[in-house]
Amino acid sequence: MPVVEETYDIVVVGAGHAGCEAALAAARLGFETIMFTVSVDSIALMPCNPNVGGSSKGHLVRELDALGGEMGKNIDKTFIQSKMLNESKGPAVHSLRAQADKQEYTRSMHRVLENTDHLTIRQAEVAEILTEEIPGEYGTFQEEHEGHQESGYPVKKRIVGVKTYSGAVYKCRAVVLATGVYL
């Protein structure tokens, strides 16, 4: 099978909540971005807990919203019920929690991603992060010791791309790993 080689600025591995937000942020800044997922049907999947909000996650969602993130907007479009938590306590600890229609949440996020300029979605599993050595201030001193190579100084490397299990190579300047619980 021939090796496909494409070039992007940013590669995002994973399409859960964090991967979606990372890919959207990069693409909205004008970086050519590709997001890998093992299944396009599982983009922004909520397999267990369909809630967004609460005292901890709610704070994070508000921070994302302030930075232009999509999670808060998406839950606003797809929630089936919401509840204010900790109402018997002081206003500082009140927090909103919304329960999403799990399938609609996934479909809605998928639509947003598909309609974002500079963003490509690819169904593939990344097998390897590709790097290359870069000469540091002192170079990359190597010596042979008792039959094997040893570095005299730390070898500096930079990311140059990723390789999928099918052998396709995607060159890039940076990789964001957002594999969640599936690493």
Tell what function each PLM region has.
Residues 4-18:
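Beta1/beta-strand and adjacent pyrophosphate-binding region of the FAD-binding site
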Residues 11-13, 169-179:
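Short hydrophobic core segments
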Residues 130-168:
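Conserved beta-strand-loop-beta-strand element in the redox core of flavoprotein oxidoreductases
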Residues 20-22:
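N-terminal amphipathic, basic-rich helices that act as targeting or association modules
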